[in-house]
Design a protein with these regions (language model features):
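Phosphate-group recognition and catalysis centered on beta-loop-alpha active-site segments
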Residues: 1-246
Length: 246
């Protein structure tokens, strides 16, 4: 089961920042998940519509100029990065899942991914584009078929994983709170992977692996990776009642 660092290693670092991304790579995460939005014609790596939760700014991200955004600091004294800065930081060292927060950011994002493949050492199969906007994913796959697409859902759809297959996705990304065995089985029957968000508890990590989930998104990737490592056999030899070691 693969481990994706959710917004980078965001449990111990400011989310969606270069330091969180670099830390996730140091932890040997299989991939990193980030969120992108458009502001002042720049693809910014940021989750919320509003600035105040994670930065010292106020107002909406989309209303700020690029210069204003550059002056802001996150709670960990980091800048809000652009997508190109994130791609340049990773340079193909792991997979990257880019979640599109709205339709307008899609074209500039895919153009940036093209640049990453041409100039920054990524292979197309390392790049995943995900969104709750399923029609948008279908349109993007028509124009950029070389990338992987994943349909996000917070509930169990009536048609289970059929929606993802219908729009040409290679995976379903599902909320851990509503994960369903029938959805996992249906997705696998259709040749789709199932990745689950957001998984921070060790017990959940182990249980999801047993359920056959293909990947998880975690704010604490090092914790999840450690939980998935095979337990090393004890170096002590077994001792029988006779006192003879075998």
């Amino acid at each position: 089961m693969q481990v994706f660092a959710h917004r980078g290693a965001s449990g111990d670092n400011p989310e969606n920042t270069l330091i969180a991304i670099e830390r996730a790579i140091q932890f040997d995460a299989d991939g990193i998940e980030i969120d992108v939005q458009l502001a002042d014609d720049q693809v910014m790596v940021f989750h919320d519509r509003w600035l105040h939760r994670t930065t010292n700014g106020i107002g909406r991200l989309r209303d700020a100029s690029f210069e204003q955004l550059r002056q802001l600091k996150t709670h960990g004294d980091q800048q809000i990065p652009t997508l190109l800065e994130v791609l340049d930081c990773i340079r193909g060292r792991c997979q990257l899942n880019v979640e599109l927060k709205h339709k307008e950011v899609a074209g500039p994002t895919l153009n940036a991914l093209d640049f990453a493949v041409e100039q920054l050492g990524f292979a197309p199969e390392q790049l995943i584009v995900s969104s709750f906007h399923h029609r948008l994913l279908s349109e993007l796959r028509y124009n950029w078929p070389q990338y992987n697409y994943a349909g996000l859902t917070a509930s169990v759809p009536l048609d289970l994983a059929e929606f993802a297959q219908r729009i040409g996705c290679s995976a379903v990304h599902m909320d851990v709170a509503n994960l369903d065995d029938d959805l996992i089985k249906d997705a696998h029957r259709r040749g789709l992977q199932v990745r689950v968000y957001t998984v921070d508890e060790v017990d959940d990590v182990i249980a999801l692996q047993a359920q056959g989930v293909d990947g998880i998104f975690s704010n604490y990737p090092s914790r999840a990776i450690a939980a998935l490592k095979p337990k090393e056999p004890s170096g002590e030899k077994a001792t029988h009642g006779s006192g003879v070691s075998t």
